[in-house]
Amino acid sequence: LPSRQELPVVAPSRAMPEEAYQDLLEKAGAYPLAYWRPLLKVLLVLLGEVGLTVKEVADLWKEDVREKSLLVRGTKLREVPLSPLAREVLSDWLPQREFLAGHQPLPYPHLLLKPAPGKNRGKPLGLGEAKWILTEFADFAGVKAEGKRRADLALPLRWRAIRRFLKEGHPREKVAYWTGMRSLMTRGWEG
């Protein structure tokens, strides 16, 4: 196994450009299946503003949302600050989440609940379903795969959040802690 210093360094050039991110947020409002639109916006913002992984987003509970921060239960519990946009999108989502939770006899504690009509409405959005809706949305938004990679929104959005944190002047150590992106701490990484 190579030592930590020998691991390839992922450049922030993989970050989604600001214009593309704003375009995605606009396209989320035009997604053909209207009941997915609010959830898509939450998903995009938690990836692109907060820097979470899709798994971390799918595992969030409603009680993890604080006024200005978010508790993330990954390999380690951590508290991540929320941008004003993330706070706004989450405050818009929470009333709809409560409505969806009311469709189940015993409401689930998860933050993201399935909005699609049917017997599964109000059940937690799992990792597979979160990846599926992101893939469907990428097709709708016209996001093209680069090289042999499939069109993946999650990693460029996550790097966009990292770039935002660094531009705001937060230390790399703090950003690595918030996002769980340990490669920020490797020697030779240039932000």
PLM feature segments, named:
Residues 74-120:
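Basic, alpha-helical nucleic-acid-contacting "clamp/cap" segments
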Residues 20-54, 158:
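Basic, Lys/Arg- and aromatic-enriched nucleic-acid-binding interface segment
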Residues 46-59, 168-170, 179-181:
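A short, glycine-centered helix-capping/turn motif at helix boundaries
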Residues 64-67, 170-190:
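Short, polar N-cap/turn motifs at the start of nucleic acid-interacting alpha helices
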Residues 33, 132-181:
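Short, basic (Lys/Arg/His-rich) helix/loop patches that form interaction surfaces
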